[in-house]
C-alpha cells in the first residue's frame, strides 16, 4: 500500500511529498530506506526491484514465497537532492545522513528525516540501501547495533560475509 506521509510546501511551486510503501500487517517490522542522498541511485534501484517482488508475493503471483511480518519502504527519501543530481539538496545543503532524528519544524531535509524516523521507529530491522562513493570499491556489508543470533541468521540467509557492530555514542 502506497501512502503519503508528509507534504511540504516548497518555494518552487508543487509541494514536496514523501511516500512510504507497506506490505503485511503483523509481526516484526523491517524498514527499508533509500535515496537519502541524490547520488545514491543503486539503493533506489534495489528498493524498486524489492517493491516489485513484494507486490508479487502479497498478490499471490509468486506462490513460492510468503510474507511473515511487515515491510515498510521509503524508496525516495530525498527527492530534491535526486532531482538536483547531487549528494545534497543545494537549497538547504544538509546531509540527510546527519539530519536524523530530524525536526518536523526544521529545514526541509530535517522535516523529511523526522517523518522517516517517526514511521520507522517501531521497526525491529532497518536497512538503508545506498551506493559506495565513486571510485571506491565496497563489498555488501551489514552495520548493526548488536550482534545476536537473529543478526547472525540474517547474515547467513542474505549471504553477507561482513557484519560490523556500530559503537554507540
Residue ranges and their predicted role:
Residues 1-169:
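Structured catalytic-domain cores with a bias toward divalent-metal coordination
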